[in-house]
From Swiss-Prot:
Protein name: NADPH:quinone oxidoreductase
Signal peptide: none
Its job: The enzyme apparently serves as a quinone reductase in connection with conjugation reactions of hydroquinones involved in detoxification pathways.
GO MF term set: NADH:ubiquinone reductase (non-electrogenic) activity; NADPH dehydrogenase (quinone) activity
Lineage: Eukaryota, Viridiplantae, Streptophyta, Embryophyta, Tracheophyta
Reaction equation(s) it catalyzes: a quinone + NADH + H(+) = a quinol + NAD(+); a quinone + NADPH + H(+) = a quinol + NADP(+)
Keywords from the UniProt entry: Cell membrane, Flavoprotein, FMN, Membrane, NAD, NADP, Oxidoreductase
GO cellular component, one term: chloroplast stroma
Quaternary structure and interacting proteins, as annotated: Homotetramer.
InterPro entries: Flavoprotein-like_sf, FMN_Rdtase-like_dom, NAD(P)H-dep_reductase
EC number: 1.6.5.2
Broad class of where this protein is predominantly found: membrane
Length: 196
């Protein structure tokens, strides 16, 4: 008798990096996550959403319930996603300004973050960006985001062994496995919230 493998429904994940730097380690984590889903996490499809084109939030830009085209396109991508993957750097114990700006634009009526499962990954020195995660979780309460609790993913990018190459690509295999566990947890949590 042949083994039957259950095919998991496709989960679309919108991935946002709070760092705009060209060789950002956070964007590198998202590239690695995309590669991992292609290699070893079937049923998960990650799309990187570039937040750099978003204008600073300004309600004067809202006209008759509509937003600038770049904001409308961003909001539509969030709306169409089943879940969210945030790569959140820590700036002054908090989230970065570009990420907060994206959170604010997508929270304008109607709030397109509402009821989305989410996960946070962070890297940096010292605490590996962990303090930004707690602030992002706090913001997420108001936005009705539902974060996975475990595994937490923080990474000291400057401790040996080398974690990233000169272009910001994740090269450490142990870290890739930790990242994979976050993706599997996000997948399972999303399916649970969807009742599947």
């Amino acid at each position: 008798m042949e083994a039957v493998t259950a095919i998991k429904p496709l989960i679309r994940v919108a991935a946002l990096s709070g760092s705009l730097r060209k060789t950002s380690f956070h964007t590198g984590l998202l590239r690695a996550a995309i590669d991992l889903t292609k290699e070893s996490v079937p049923g998960l499809q990650i799309e990187y959403i570039d937040i750099s084109p978003l204008p600073l939030i300004n309600t004067d830009l809202e006209v008759n319930g509509t937003y600038p085209p770049v904001v409308e396109a961003f909001r539509q991508k969030i709306l169409e996603a089943d879940s969210i993957l945030f790569a959140s750097p820590e700036y002054n114990f908090s989230v970065s300004a570009p990420l907060k700006n994206a959170l604010d634009w997508a929270s304008r009526p109607p709030n397109v973050w509402a009821d989305k499962p989410a996960a946070i990954i962070s890297t940096g020195g010292g605490f590996g960006g962990g303090r930004s995660q707690y602030h992002l979780r706090q913001i997420g309460v108001f936005l009705d985001l539902h974060f996975i609790n475990k595994p937490e993913f923080t990474l000291n990018a400057f401790q040996p062994p080398q974690k990233f190459d000169a272009e910001g690509n994740l090269v450490d295999e142990v870290t890739k496995e930790r990242l994979k566990q976050v993706l599997l947890s996000l997948q399972a949590f999303t399916l649970r919230l969807q009742g599947k």
